[in-house]
Structure formats: C-alpha cells, structure tokens
Amino acid sequence: MAVTPLVDLSTRKLWRALGRPIDPAGEHAWLRAPTSTSAVVRDGWLAAEAAVHGGTVDETTSGAGLLASLDLLDGPGFRARDVAPQVRDFYEHTSAWGVEVWSGWSPWAWPGGELISRFFGKRVEQLALPMRPLDVAQGMDSRVSVIRDAAGRQVAAGWLRTLRATGDYVFSGCYSARRLPGAARASVHVAFPLESGNLQVFLRPEVLPDGSFRLVSPPGRFGADGAYVVAADGGRTYAARVPVHESFHLYVDDRGVLRTDHVLRLWGATAMRLHYKLEPAR
C-alpha cells in the first residue's frame, strides 16, 4: 500500500479515537455534510451533494451567491437589513466580486502550517493555506456553483478557489445557512469535504453599529458554533470538536472599498491573519 493512503487512513483512525460516534442521518443531522470519495478533493463532491437533495449543480447563474439571501440568518440579535449593502451584495452575488488576498503567519504557527500545506493541503487540493505572500501574488480565481434541490431552490453553494498561476485548488467549500440544535437563529455553515469526512465550521453572524458584518466561530460545547472534524471509519461516523477559532470582519473602508479581516486562532493564540480586498468584477 502507498504511503499517502496509509497516512490518510491513520488520520481517520485518530479522529475516530478523539471523537464521538454520531448519527448524521438522525440525531446529528446538523453535521451531515459533503465528503469526497477520492483523496484529491477539487470539485468532485458537487454532483453527489446535489443528488442528496434530489437536485442539480447550477454553473450558469450569473451573480450566484454563497447564500440565496442574507435574510436566512435573521433571528433574535441579528437583522440582515442592518448590514451594509456592499456586504450583503457580496454574500448574495459572490461570483460578481473579485478577491485579492494577503496572508501572514505568526512565527510559532508557521512550521506547522507549512507541514500541513505541503504534505496535506497541496496533495489533496483542499485547505491548502497560502504560506507566503508570493503564493497568491498572481491572485486567486473563484467559482460559485449553486446546489439546487428538486424544486430549483438554492440549498447550498460550492465556493471553489484556485491559484491563478497554477490552477491548483486552495479551498473547496460548501456554504449554507444552518441552525444548530436549540439555536434561535441560523449560523453560516461551511463544510470542506475530505476523503471519507470533512472539516465543518459554524460561524455566528453579528452586525455592528456601522453596518459591518462579523462571523465568529468561538470556543464552546459540542453542538454550539465552532469547528468540527467528521470522519467515517469502519461503517460508523465520528465527530470531534476542534480548537480552531475564526473571525471574519467585513467592512467598507473610508474610500468605499469592501474589505475583510480574517483571523485564525488555535485555542486562544493567533496563528494566521488574512486580509481580503473585495471589488465588483461586473
């Protein structure tokens, strides 16, 4: 057997040991999300996820968004109508926006990030975090693929980001609005398919007094907003909450440009910062 399949199998065994058994078709349906049937992820999961909903993958809609409407997040403590129009347009018409990105790693986290990116992310073409500014110097291309159910309604969207210089996949995520058990309103749910599993993040939406928009995956209990690893092994599925915490702050600067500050933390320590400049491409 080749080394890389052994490594991936060992990883699933690790998450089985660290996690708890779940029933994604029943009690833990909030953790049901797309997986990859092969080691290299790319966009291979899209058709299978559409089939789960009895629908299709829509690659033709102009101005497709990660969410059909930001109103899906409305509930106690959040009103989409209070969000700045540019922010709302980005989420509802993501494919009509161009993205420039800059990244910076904390010195303590860089070696681990380099190992993960080189030996995992780049190999499977998923979660291949940029390690150096030159990695994204020529920019990233993005594509939004809408997943529709049998009635034609958008139930999720794939946001696929590739390096313009090489065409290699950096991120391949499934975006939707999803309500956690007992929650009064929906969170933004992002699932990154992996072979026989996925990484999922539930982000709590917040609107600030200036109309800027914040998404946070804080520490907490199992079943609350945060990050989870799900892995299938031996005919069962396991899930573990992981100490990865993110925040996204989308705001309009004093020149009218939409920007995002993205902070990735492990436990409470900042591991990586990214900054995005978002401009209409249409």
Residue ranges, per PLM feature:
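Soluble ligand-binding/transfer domains with enclosed cavities or grooves
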Residues: 18-275, 279
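Cationic, amphipathic, low-complexity segments that mediate targeting or membrane/lipid association
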Residues: 2-9, 13
